[in-house]
Amino acid sequence: MTSLIKPLAQASAALALCAGLSSPSFAAATAPVQTAPTIFSPGVISGAGHDAAPAFTPDGDTVYFGRQAPDTAAIMESHRIADGWSEPRIADFSGEWSDMEPSMAPDGSYMVYVSNRPARAGDKPGDGFYNGKAWPGKASALWQVRRTGKGWSAPERLPEQINRSTSIYAPTVAADGSLYFMQPNTKTGNFQLFRSQMRDGRFEEPQPLPFSGGEQNDVDPAVAPDESFLIFGSRREPASKSMDLFVVFRGGAGWGTPQWLGDVVNGPNSDAEARLSPDLKTLYFSSERTVPVGYPRTREQTRADLKRIAAWDNSLYNIWQVPLRPLLEKYRGEFGAR
């Protein structure tokens, strides 16, 4: 959720990496040094708007992401070029309704996203309700587009057992088609995380994840293709004042206890909208952090600051990136030690 406050071979490679991350030889390796997050494509993909939730094609050469302001949102498309990324354009299936939070299936055959598009043509968007208040015209549901020989299919609304809530956000797709997402707890109004098992081509009834009970806001799940781990945003301790990122692993006994990703990944303000690169080497997330400055400064430094602020560094969500492997190694080791 945003500001609420080649093919199968590559998918198989990603699954193999997931398995390798849990192997004894991997766990025994020397932990790589964790590096600080860096801004992703500043001024192009991370721009002056509220940018979040990158979804990459399996080859990593095309990215879809959400760009929004308080009353409008669209899914954007950009392609890798020699010196970075192309100027984003509105994705072919977006632009008529408020669309956000695309999530690519690991094999690239379809994409699920959030939209206020009404279920019936001709209707107006309904009202959403979460965090104890109504949001007129901001009902949301999960929709899907499928890859065709000519691009993307027309949007299809996911079935009603998925879209019962008027405020459903942040889809993420596992390799077997199972779907994770967030929706409000019916008693507290806080967002909690759900999973719907895909079985025989159909979604089963969504079930809340055992570590997410609605006591506080849990948002934006990003699940590994093999469902061995999940990264999400939460207001749980120690993130009581802002949204921070947590990781949780699944072992033989099920899901473990969520672990805070620390103050190298998490900044002083909100960090959420986690996404995983197709090769599972990079964690992407959206953050309100800004580039720190010191004083005194030269006029040249200030001019550079103002140029950067106009391009992207303005306290809105931008997309940041950090190596994923060191994080998984560190926190999986702590999970295994418990």
Regions found by a protein language model. Give the residues of each.
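Low-complexity, intrinsically disordered segments with a bias for serine/threonine
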Residues: 7, 16, 26-29
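Bacterial N-terminal signal peptides that target proteins for export
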Residues: 2-13
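Bacterial N-terminal signal peptides
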Residues: 11-23
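Short, conserved micro-motifs composed of acidic
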Residues: 27-338
